[in-house]
Design a protein with these regions (language model features):
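Catalytic loop of the DD-peptidase/beta-lactamase superfamily, centered on the K-T-G motif
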Residues: 1-135
Length: 135
């Protein structure tokens, strides 16, 4: 992964965290679009199937407009708050966006065949543990 790609990913996550406004103050997405990303669209069996994806790493999450969204933190042992959203790539990249506490996390990895679902929750919880320890 090139350094520019990492920087772009981080800027994109920060923009989402700021409700669609980039770090330079320019509106890139409407707030409603970001809210749609955080609003679960799955019901019933589709929601149950989504929880099983990635080695059961999506328990407690639903799926909005192109992103997973945390609906029940206790089902995922998450230290983040409900409403946190993001996505993970097939080779292990991981994004967490949480406008409620102003967290934009990007974990970069490109490894075919990795079991990324084994550690994404740990990475997320380590970040949140450090945030909550400072409050």
């Amino acid at each position: 992964m090139h350094n520019e790609s990492v920087q772009d990913y981080i800027l994109f996550a920060e923009m989402l965290c700021n409700g669609g406004v980039g770090v330079n103050g320019t509106r890139i997405l409407q707030r409603e679009t970001v809210d749609d990303m955080r609003t679960n669209r799955l019901q019933g069996e589709a929601l149950e199937d989504f929880a099983k994806f990635g080695g059961w790493s999506k328990g407690g999450y639903g799926y909005g407009l192109g992103a997973r969204t945390l609906m029940d933190r206790e089902k995922n042992n998450a230290l983040s708050e409900n409403g946190e959203f993001g996505w993970d790539g097939a080779r292990g990249c991981y994004v967490v966006v949480d406008p409620n506490v102003q967290v934009a996390l990007f974990y970069a990895q490109q490894e075919a065949g990795s079991t990324w679902w084994d550690w994404h929750g740990t990475v997320r919880n380590m970040v949140y543990a450090s945030i909550w320890a400072d409050r």
